[in-house]
Curated annotation (Swiss-Prot):
Originating organism: Candida albicans (strain SC5314 / ATCC MYA-2876)
Entry-linked CDD domains: PAP2_Aur1_like (cd03386)
Identification of the protein by name: Inositol phosphorylceramide synthase
Segments in the Cytoplasmic topological domain: 1-54, 99-100, 190-191, 280-281, 326-471
InterPro entries, sorted: Aur1/Ipt1, IPC_Synthase-Related, P_Acid_Pase_2/haloperoxidase
Gene3D superfamilies: Phosphatidic acid phosphatase type 2/haloperoxidase
GO process terms (BP): mannosyl diphosphorylinositol ceramide metabolic process; sphingolipid biosynthetic process; sphingolipid metabolic process
One GO molecular-function entry: inositol phosphoceramide synthase activity
Ranges annotated as biased composition (Polar residues): 399-422, 451-462
Activity regulation, per record: Inhibited by aureobasidin A (AbA), khafrefungin and rustmicin.
């Protein structure tokens, strides 16, 4: 029965299409894009036993486990209900097949657990709610309450336009983007997305707990009178959507929200900006489309009176900070010309030393700029204590193309320097002495470039000498 189902056209046709467009991109012998289908828990236990923990890993898992322990203690559910849930998640973390997805999503699970526990935290543990700070900052920074300005004129068409990004796309698009990153991004990119998305929301909830602030709808309903935790929330402009559709989609949910006074920072803005940053990283050609989506959601949050503009800026800054940390710490490079995850034969990450202008290993972007190239060589020579001159390898960039669209890989030289194009200031006698050391043949692109290699140049060489030689 099972074999007949697998052989049916309903299963075979999608598999053939998936194999044609995705699996056919995989290079023979490459395993970097493979998934782990092992279900033996002993495999994970052996890895855990021999794993050497770094300081970052200890802080990462210690921080998340401490929050989960707080949730376990505070959440008012029976121990016999919480224990099976913990055991189920522990099993998913130990099975290799599921742990490759559940473990990177641990920040997301921690954020969700803390969010739904906020309403159960005793009120005496919570700080006072601020009502005047956000509208005052809005007026000081931007001259007016932008949320009230945008919500002055309301129509059914504008309500629908604001409802789509705020009430529909916001809750569904993270799952769509995760699938897109898994298919079209490099291997391990989905782990980075789970880390960044989870930590951004987790830190945002912690800030909302430490700094509870009333949203614009509170000022419209209660003015600037003091707020307390016994008050119910409001759907704001989304209440008009419930009346328009005749369905209670948001009124009850927002009235009994876990965090009613969580205006700052806006996690709607934070999630949106995080999604836009990953989309710009994955598909940079469509930046205008992604930025348009972010502007659309920003407008909807203020039109529906759920956030001030300063809340949106706070969420965006939080998202940008977490993304930049993830980008330079965990996120692999997205190579142009590669179609999907199965097109990759190796995983490369950003080397901060190569993009830092003050670093010894800095590589100028414009290799044809003689002045910047000369300055880099002189600066590097001044940092090297040994008097011997290092070999001058040419820099290469590997440009990988998908096998089904182009069968071979091309090598693109980044430097046009040859033995006949020497830097002024090097004597011919020095060249003859170094003839035995410097090879005229091009180094192999499969060999690692020596980290200590620099361009040899005289310390007396300057930009003026370069200009005089040209004349």
């Amino acid at each position: 029965m099972a074999s007949s189902i697998l052989r049916s056209k309903i299963i075979q046709k999608p598999y053939q299409l998936f194999h044609y467009y995705f699996l056919s991109e995989k290079a023979p012998g490459s395993t970097v894009s493979d998934l782990n289908f092992d279900t033996n828990i002993q495999t994970s236990l052996r890895k855990l036993k021999h794993h050497h923990w770094t300081v970052g890993e200890i802080f990462h898992y210690g921080f998340l486990v401490s929050i989960l322990f707080f949730v376990f203690v505070v959440f008012p559910a029976s121990f016999f209900i919480k224990l099976p849930i913990i055991l189920a998640f522990a099993t998913c973390f130990l099975i290799p097949l599921t742990s490759q997805f559940f473990l990177p999503a641990l920040p997301v699970f921690t954020w969700l657990a803390l969010y739904f526990t906020c309403a159960k935290i005793p009120q005496e543990w919570k700080p006072a709610i601020t009502v005047k700070v956000l509208p005052a900052m809005e007026t000081i920074l931007y001259g007016d309450n932008l949320s009230n300005v945008l919500a002055t004129i309301t129509t059914g068409v504008l309500d629908i336009l604001a409802w789509l990004p705020y009430g529909i796309i916001h809750f569904s698009f993270p799952f769509v983007l995760a699938a897109i990153i898994f298919l079209f991004g490099p291997p391990t990119a989905l782990r980075s997305f789970g880390f960044a998305f989870g930590y951004m929301n987790l830190l945002g909830v912690l800030i909302q707990m430490a700094f509870p602030a009333a949203p614009p709808w509170y000022k419209n309903l209660h003015g600037l009178e003091p707020a307390n935790y016994s008050m119910h929330g409001s759907p704001g402009g989304l209440g008009r959507i419930d009346k328009l559709l005749g369905v209670d989609m948001y009124t009850t949910g927002f009235s009994n929200s876990s965090i009613i006074f969580g205006a700052f920072p806006s996690l709607h803005s934070g999630c949106c900006i995080m999604e836009v940053l990953f989309l710009c990283w994955l598909f940079p050609r469509f930046k205008f489309v992604w930025v348009t989506y972010a502007s659309w959601l920003w407008w909807s949050t203020m039109y529906l009176t759920h956030h001030y503009f300063v809340d949106l800026i706070g969420g965006a800054m939080l998202s940008l900070t977490v993304f930049e940390f993830t980008k330079y710490k965990y996120l692999p490079k997205n190579k142009e010309g590669l179609f999907c995850r199965w097109s990759y034969t190796e995983i490369e990450k950003i080397d901060i030393q190569e993009i830092d202008p003050l670093s010894y290993n800095y590589i100028p972007i414009n290799s044809n700029d003689n002045e910047s190239r000369l300055y880099t060589r002189v600066y590097q020579e001044s940092q090297v204590s040994p008097p011997s001159r290092a070999e001058t390898p040419e820099a290469f960039e590997m440009s990988n193309f998908s096998r089904s669209r182009q069968s071979s890989k091309t090598q693109v030289p980044l430097s046009n320097l040859t033995n006949n194009d020497q830097v002024p200031g090097i004597n011919e006698e020095d060249e003859e002495e170094e003839g035995d050391e410097i090879s005229s043949s091009t180094p192999s692109v499969f060999e690692d470039e020596p980290q200590g290699s620099t361009y040899a140049a005289s310390s007396a060489t300057s930009v003026d000498d370069l200009d005089s030689k040209r004349n």
